[in-house]
Amino acid sequence: PPMTTETAHISVVSREGDAVVVTTTINYWFGSGLRSPSTGVILNDEMDDFSAHDIQNIYGVPPSKANFIVPGKRPQSSTCPSIFVNEGGDVVMAIGASGGTRITSSVSLTSMRVLWLGRNIKEAIDEPRLHHQLLPDEIEYEFKFPNEILEKLKAIGHKTKPAGAFGSLVVGIKRMKGGTLTANYDYRRGGSVDGFK
């Protein structure tokens, strides 16, 4: 797969039932573009996740006073690595994504499709998605998103617009009844899944 320069996500479930989900980022455009000469570590540009007065971010989000820079404060983040468990505490699904502000909508929609609508993990990840980030007040939709749903959204006052490349990559693992693990990696940006006995 091609190398990307921003966020990465990994979901892991062990045969013993332990789960780890990690979303990590150096932010946009290969971090700060700087590498430590002594360690070789690439430096991030997470300061860009704070709001700056009168400057919209790369995703079209306007500045918010709640996200202005303050000493000791962390910037707002869209990452949402998630582990779902059943009533007994057993892992049912491990999921997360990359893709800036689209992470939250992609993870929540994919999770809903699996947990509420009974889709398998591949169907849930591969199906077309919607995205709404509150501001600007519009719903972006992927090519082939069901027109019937879009028309219903328009009928209740939503503005819709087609999204170009959707840019969010979801990785998920679902435990099936009987304990079998199934996994899928989003076709939208390339990658792979693997399993070991």
Curated annotation (Swiss-Prot):
GO terms for molecular function: glutathione hydrolase activity; potassium channel regulator activity; toxin activity. Residues 1-6 form the signal peptide. InterPro entries: GGT_peptidase, GGT_ssub, Ntn_hydrolases_N. Keywords: Hemostasis impairing toxin, Ion channel impairing toxin, Platelet aggregation activating toxin, Potassium channel impairing toxin, Secreted, Signal, Toxin, Voltage-gated potassium channel impairing toxin. It is found in: Secreted. One of its GO terms (cellular component) is extracellular region. Expressed by the venom gland. GO terms for biological process: glutathione catabolic process. Pfam families: G_glu_transpept. It comes from the Eukaryota. May act as a voltage-gated potassium channel inhibitor. Is highly similar to the subunit beta of SSD14 which, when complexed with subunit alpha, induces platelet aggregation and hemolysis. Belongs to the scoloptoxin-11 family. This is Scoloptoxin SSD20. The lineage of its organism: Eukaryota, Metazoa, Ecdysozoa, Arthropoda, Myriapoda.
